[in-house]
């Protein structure tokens, strides 16, 4: 099997690495890729938002399956174009990808499916903003206001704050840009990222993970695309994941089938584990980054065959997933000034050692690897337990040099110390 992976981040590097371990995968292609993925796959620079260009590339490289990593091509309908060309695709249709592309649509689907989530309201007009803010946050007993961009925002469109002025400024800025605003009640509890492989009707959950969205230690500063992750979650009872599967993911998948938009791909549910059980924070239509890096590091089943089964509607016949023992930790090395406009073009030293997955990197004509984005690298390590995996990840990242770079030093710390309780 020849597999074409679409994307250029550490998530795609992790996908390629896991696919390379599948004995049935005989060839790997990536578009556009980065300086690290070039060691695993043929690379092509194409417009990944163009279904026509992706189909042409898939035909040229004789791909048996296309795996779409980022959300934007999915929301734009690239998976539809690939399937229409008769090529197996892992990734939802444009209609099904609305579960991430529009938070209002996701809320509508959850309501129809009877899924537990936060109370919410869409604000389309600045004139309605102040009254809407009065119905959320501390005025009604919530710890914080939760203000979200209804559209795609690369993980950076959310503000959670107890300061009304901060909430209002963020919401007003979104409205001024022409983006609807979603206000939500605050869900109190540790968060979980649960990935589920779905072929339309059959749902197969992967290991739960936890990511770290804020840029600063102690969950401070603005939101990012993700600064680190770990798996599995020693503090999470198995029954919570089972409850999430049967009361959240399966009903949502069934509702999408009912609407004529069956979901075929990776359905990612972000959960808050509250005192009353799991509740949905968000849905995404693709593998999350950096959680993918830790989940796939522990996967012992053949990834290519798993994704192909989902893409061909035969997931029910795949069988039980197998996992390696131990734990995995990913720590993101970010460029100076990230998550604002990052500094780029600096030489990255030590990026070609084992455990380093590339994201915002490119290779100059002289062969030197330089930074090209905000999240530059993901350092991934495994160990017998979370503490061992953390130690190894931080040992590796300590050997990498990039001018002005930064990373969080507390990824997985509370879990390793047994300080997370539900």
From Swiss-Prot:
Q: What's the record's note on cofactor binding?
A: Binds 1 Mg(2+) or Mn(2+) ion per subunit.
Which controlled-vocabulary keywords does the entry list?
ATP-binding, Ligase, Magnesium, Manganese, Metal-binding, Nucleotide-binding, Purine biosynthesis
Domain ATP-grasp as annotated: residue spans: 107-312
UniProt KW Nucleotide-binding keyword: yes
Q: Which cofactor does it need?
A: Mg(2+); Mn(2+)
Q: In which pathway does it act?
A: Purine metabolism; IMP biosynthesis via de novo pathway; N(1)-(5-phospho-D-ribosyl)glycinamide from 5-phospho-alpha-D-ribose 1-diphosphate: step 2/2
Q: Which residues bind Mg(2+)?
A: 282, 284
Annotated catalysed reactions: 5-phospho-beta-D-ribosylamine + glycine + ATP = N(1)-(5-phospho-beta-D-ribosyl)glycinamide + ADP + phosphate + H(+)
Top-level enzyme category: ligase
Q: What is its EC number?
A: 6.3.4.13
Molecular functions per Gene Ontology: ATP binding; metal ion binding; phosphoribosylamine-glycine ligase activity
Tell me which PROSITE patterns the record gives: ATP_GRASP, GARS
What the entry lists under Gene3D superfamilies is as follows: 3.40.50.20, ATP-grasp fold, A domain (3.30.1490.20), ATP-grasp fold, B domain (3.30.470.20), Phosphoribosylglycinamide synthetase, C-terminal domain (3.90.600.10)
Q: So where does ATP get bound?
A: 138-193
* Record InterPro entries: ATP-grasp (IPR011761), ATP_grasp_subdomain_1 (IPR013815), PreATP-grasp_dom_sf (IPR016185), PRibGlycinamid_synth_ATP-grasp (IPR020561), PRibGlycinamide_synth (IPR000115), PRibGlycinamide_synth_C-dom (IPR020560), PRibGlycinamide_synth_C_sf (IPR037123), PRibGlycinamide_synth_CS (IPR020559)
Report the record's Gene Ontology biological process terms: 'de novo' IMP biosynthetic process; purine nucleobase biosynthetic process
Q: Which SMART domains match?
A: GARS_A (SM01209), GARS_C (SM01210)
Protein family (similarity comment) = Belongs to the GARS family.
What this protein is called in its record is: Phosphoribosylamine--glycine ligase
Q: Which organism is it from?
A: Mycobacterium leprae (strain TN)
Gene name of the encoded protein: purD
């Amino acid at each position: 099997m020849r597999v074409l992976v679409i994307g250029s981040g550490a998530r795609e590097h992790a996908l390629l690495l896991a696919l390379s371990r599948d004995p049935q995968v005989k060839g790997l292609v990536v578009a556009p890729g980065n300086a690290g993925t070039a060691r695993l796959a043929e690379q092509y620079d194409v417009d990944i938002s163009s279904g026509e260009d992706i189909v042409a590339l898939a035909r040229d490289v004789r791909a048996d399956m296309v795996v779409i990593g980022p959300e934007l091509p999915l929301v734009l309908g690239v998976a539809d174009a690939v399937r229409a060309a008769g090529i197996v695709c892992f990734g939802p249709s444009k209609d099904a990808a609305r579960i991430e592309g529009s938070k209002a649509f996701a809320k509508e689907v959850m309501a129809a499916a009877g899924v537990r989530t936060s109370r919410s309201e869409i604000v389309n007009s600045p004139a309605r903003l102040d009254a809407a803010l009065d119905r959320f946050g501390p005025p009604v007993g919530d710890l914080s206001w939760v203000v979200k961009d209804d559209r795609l925002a690369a993980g950076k469109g959310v503000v959670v704050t107890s300061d009304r002025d901060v909430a209002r400024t963020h919401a007003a800025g979104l409205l001024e840009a022409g983006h609807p605003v979603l206000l939500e009640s605050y869900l109190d509890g540790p968060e979980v990222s649960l990935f589920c492989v779905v072929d339309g009707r059959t749902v197969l959950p992967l290991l739960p993970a936890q990511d770290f969205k804020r840029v600063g230690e102690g969950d401070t500063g603005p939101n990012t695309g993700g600064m680190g992750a770990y798996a599995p979650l020693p503090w999470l009872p198995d029954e919570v994941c089972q409850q999430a599967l049967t009361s959240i993911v399966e009903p949502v998948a069934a509702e999408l089938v009912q609407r004529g938009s069956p979901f075929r791909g990776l359905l990612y549910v972000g959960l808050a584990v509250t005192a009353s059980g799991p509740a949905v924070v968000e849905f995404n239509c693709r593998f999350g980054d950096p959680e993918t890096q830790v989940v796939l590091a522990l996967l012992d089943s053949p990834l290519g065959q798993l994704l192909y089964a989902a893409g061909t509607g035969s997931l029910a016949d795949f069988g039980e997933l197998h996992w390696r023992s131990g734990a995995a930790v990913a720590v993101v090395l970010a460029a100076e000034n990230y998550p604002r406009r990052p500094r780029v073009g600096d030489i990255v030293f030590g990026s070609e050692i084992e455990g380093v997955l590339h994201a915002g990197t490119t290779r100059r004509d002289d062969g030197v690897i330089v930074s090209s984005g905000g999240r530059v690298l993901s350092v991934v390590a495994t160990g017998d337990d979370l503490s061992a995996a953390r130690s190894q990840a931080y040992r590796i990242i300590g050997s990498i040099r990039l001018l002005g770079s930064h990373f969080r030093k507390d990824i997985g710390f509370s879990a390793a110390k047994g300080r997370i309780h539900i």
